[in-house]
């Protein structure tokens, strides 16, 4: 089946993450369903730009966000490029498809006061869950890693001697991120509590190569649990409507930039392939400068 061959291509050649592959598969299944229900077309190769446009219009009419629609366009572009590569298409139907423009929104981030309150005033508790949750939040803010990257960290990815963490990013790109003494102390505290937690022995696979973050049953945490943990604690210190792990990634980058870090260094730490992706954080800094200017300049 063509879709299966495409998924294999993403998995073994492009080496996309499981999360990305599931999203691409879901997009293709959704488009296939649309073609069948609306036009009685089963073969994706029989599609053309007019059918694709009609699907995109229907998505927007169903109140899908522009960002969501653009991701689905990316899926179809990737799929039909694959079909071209396989010699299955004479003309790529995506050539005449234009993605809707996304209104640029500045990244949401927490203030220094928010962060101080989170780590100095919030009571995480002294047990396994509390130490784990605090370390999860600490790592997000201290390293700027993505949620998928965090859940996949193994204990042997951490080198406490050199103060570094090895992270496997998008498309399996590996990078090394430095960590400071405070983070190392939190890691040591969590590992000590985890090793002394008798409930951990429920999972016979737990050893030196295991996933760093586990549940109280000794199972690896999943992205959904990590999201709920972060949202729970950020809701205690911020009234923002956006309280996801990515907010802590934005906060890491913004605070680094505000405190004088080189933007190229931030790019490497975040695992961005392009500097353009990192430069969005400079807009927050510019807005901050504008505020200071208006407050301080006599003719502002």
Per-region residue spans from a language model:
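Conserved catalytic core of the tyrosine transesterase superfamily
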Residues: 1-300
């Amino acid at each position: 089946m063509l879709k299966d061959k495409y998924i294999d291509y993403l998995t073994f050649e492009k080496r996309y993450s499981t999360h990305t592959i599931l999203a691409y598969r879901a997009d293709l299944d959704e488009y296939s369903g649309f073609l069948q229900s609306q036009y009685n077309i089963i073969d994706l190769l029989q599609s053309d730009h007019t059918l694709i446009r009609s699907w995109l219009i229907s998505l927007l009419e169903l109140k899908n966000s522009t960002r969501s629609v653009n991701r689905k366009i990316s899926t179809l572009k990737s799929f039909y490029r694959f079909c071209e590569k396989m010699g299955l298409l004479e003309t790529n139907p995506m050539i005449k498809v234009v993605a809707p423009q996304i209104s640029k929104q500045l990244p949401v981030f927490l203030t220094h006061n928010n962060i101080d309150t989170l780590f100095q005033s919030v009571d995480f508790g002294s047990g396994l869950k509390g130490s784990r949750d605090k370390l999860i939040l600490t790592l997000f803010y201290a390293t700027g890693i993505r949620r998928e990257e965090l859940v996949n960290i193994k204990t042997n990815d951490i080198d406490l001697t050199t103060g570094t963490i090895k992270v496997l990013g998008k498309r399996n790109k590996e990078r090394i991120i430095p960590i400071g003494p405070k983070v190392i102390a939190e890691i040591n505290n969590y590992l000590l509590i985890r090793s002394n937690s008798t409930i951990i022995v429920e999972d016979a696979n737990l050893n030196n190569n295991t996933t760093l973050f586990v549940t109280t049953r000794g199972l690896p945490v999943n992205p959904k649990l990590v999201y709920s943990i972060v949202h729970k604690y950020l809701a205690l210190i911020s009234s923002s409507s956006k309280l996801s792990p990515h907010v802590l990634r934005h906060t890491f980058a913004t605070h680094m930039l505000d405190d004088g870090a080189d933007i190229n260094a931030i790019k490497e730490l975040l695992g961005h392939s392009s500097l353009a992706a990192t430069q969005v954080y400079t807009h927050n800094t510019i807005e901050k400068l504008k505020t200071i200017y208006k407050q301080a300049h006599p003719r502002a």
